[in-house]
Swiss-Prot record:
The gene is dgk-3. Residues 423-558 form the DAGKc domain. One of its GO terms (molecular function) is zinc ion binding. Its EC number is 2.7.1.107. It comes from Caenorhabditis elegans. Keywords: ATP-binding, Calcium, Kinase, Metal-binding, Nucleotide-binding, Repeat, Transferase, Zinc, Zinc-finger. This is Probable diacylglycerol kinase 3. The keyword Magnesium does not apply. Ca(2+) 2 binds at D228, D230, D232, E239. GO terms for biological process: diacylglycerol metabolic process; intracellular signal transduction; olfactory behavior; phosphatidic acid biosynthetic process; phospholipase C-activating G protein-coupled receptor signaling pathway; regulation of long-term neuronal synaptic plasticity; thermotaxis. It is an enzyme of class 2 (transferase). Ca(2+) 1 binds at D183, D185, N187, E194.
Amino acid sequence: MLLSPEQFSRLSEYAAYSRRKLKDMLSDFQQDGKFYSYLSVDGQTINIDGFRAFLIDYFGADLPSDLVDQLFLSFSKPPIKERRTSLFEDAISTVRAKFSESLSGRMAGLNIAGGSGQQTDRSQSSEPQALVCIPEDDVMGPRVANNDSQEPRIPLKPLICTLSLLEADTPENKLDVVFHVYDSDGNGFLDKSEIDGIIEQMMNVARYQQWDTIELEQVIRQMMVDIDYDNDGIVSFDEWRRGGLTNIPLLVLLGFDTEMKEDGSHVWRLRHFTKPTYCNACCSILVGWGGKQGLSCSLCKYTVHERCVRSAATNCIRTYSSRQQDKLYHHWQDANATAKCVKCKATVGVFQGKGCRWCHNYVHHRCMSALAQECDLGALVHHILPPTHIFPAFLERKTSTSLKNHNFSSHSASLLQAVSPSNDCRPLLVLVNPKSGGKQGVKILQKFEYLLNPRQVYDLSKTGPEPGLQLFSTLKNCNILVCGGDGTIGWVLESMDKMTFPHGRPPVAVLPLGTGNDLARCLRWGGGYENENLHKILEQIEKSSLIDMDRWQIKIEITENKSARRASEKGDTPPYSIINNYFSIGVDASIAHRFHVMREKFPEKFNSRMRNKLWYFELGTSETLSSSCKNLHEQIDILCDGESIDLGQDASLEGIALLNIPSIYGGSNLWGRSRKSKGRMPGLFPMKNAEKMQLQTRVQDIGDGLIELVGLESAMQMGQIKAGVRGARRLSQCSTVVIQTHKSFPMQIDGEPWMQPPCIIQITHKNQAKMLVAAAPRKRSSWMLLKRQSTNDDN
């Protein structure tokens, strides 16, 4: 069995939306479970109907039939035969075979222990054994199901283990799942055939991730032999957990996430290098043929071969101080690649100098005496929280803030306290949502962990924003960088509302990773991250300015009795109680709601910004033809600052929107540009027309305590607004809004849609959040361009 990289990627996208835990679902395969009827008599295989029902229950969505069929076929196939190899590859295979023979003596001892007295034909055979997850007859032979039908079936073990790789769980729990799944006889031990299944699973992971597997198989086999600590030929559960948690390659190859457990311990990830790089342990070059070439620490870039990881020095950075100290010294490591010397500016050859993890400077061995021992943190000193300013909370320190009034969570960050640097630095708290922007979030997380102190960088999908906010709450001067979409920003701001900041609420900058990124656009951070250099983004944060942004409280009260409501008008739960960007009812929310439903059902079709925009265009076209929200004024009443708004005046509306920022739908300005105010003769125009003219001159400001109300005529008008040729109809600018709906309407808050039954909506001002605005880009005048052109021509 082997999934293609595309199938594995599609499964990963669905897993991001799953709410179930695989470990909890294993009980459903027991005799009283809902999936038991789909199993074969021996409980080892499952039919296509059970496979489909299990996937729907696990992912919480109907997977496309083509994907289900492809997955079922992949799991039912035996291992794919290798392609015809070249002479060079044949030579390598010969070397691997000889190396395998040297290990055959130790591997022969891995068979079933005396108690059971049963062995499979495969374990007794002297022929080379195929690396499959279960015995070959279980995969290829026909199964007699509970209903005595002859139908295609797939082995259950590879399915469970493959899905376990997609879950965000602790290594301990994942190791438990793998052990119990492959312990087919349930005796608490892994015999040779069961270990072969685990090895094949690890090789599959290597193929999914397109790693270099030339020498990987022998490394894995040697590793599995070493886990058998008592050399009795079988691996117990205790040996499995002990070996799994202490052998980093095993965790990586099983697809498990490695966490930063103790200071000084490396956090490994497999990596491919674009330039010649050498192993820090054996000092030989890392060689690979297009695949991953070695294990590299995400925190300090210490790099080794897979086979050398056990001999790697435990010399990673210390992210906090276990005792009171004020000076930070360089953290030197041997230069395993070429770089420039910070002193003499000459090239530092491989292992001819050292590099500091904190200031990222390299220096020759001969130049080290001329360099100060104390580290100044280099070019990023403004953003780094030094480890000397993070220490255990129980340590008393004169410069620290009292902890008596702080309620710490159970997270490890609650055991640490941070103090502000004495200089003018503003340490940066980085909160990353790895689910935003495809794979961009994961890469940004790893890069920031290396550029800054890893204690400053948090994965929101694992910890949420609270641990990082709690650690930084005691700092006098700090900034926050949210890497994600508009929903991620709202999540962080709402978490900040629940906390106390003794020195004032820190300002927030945005690195846009979402689809619309409207808040990032109006704060000049751009419409999306385009792989810019993170050093430049940190420079922009350092030069940014402060602004206050209004935030609005929304309360929704259902007016109709739930029992009297029709089944077709069943509503959803509102996603937020606070408006940061906008709130809308009608045509635009209808398109967004249909987009949201489609994305949850087929997430693999929404994996890029361009494809998302095309889907919006298609759904907008269908909404134009259907006009599902026409005659909106007949079903909605609105009061702005106590005055009723006539929605039926002039053209009929199909939607309304309340705007807090001047960007919506990925950069559209619904309020539009304001006209210049002109004087008029008193009494020349009626009062209503005068108020309408005055409304056209009002300017939108995100910090004026006012929210703007506009009307949308149709989906076609939304396209015209997006093109910049037209604006929405201005209705009001006010500080309080009350809306009553008389039927179910699609609604959305900050891009998160839902279907809302008849209700009364109250919107009031909540507070203001401090945000960072990027500096306006410099405009090059035509004179400067002409001058530069003439200068170049002269040269």
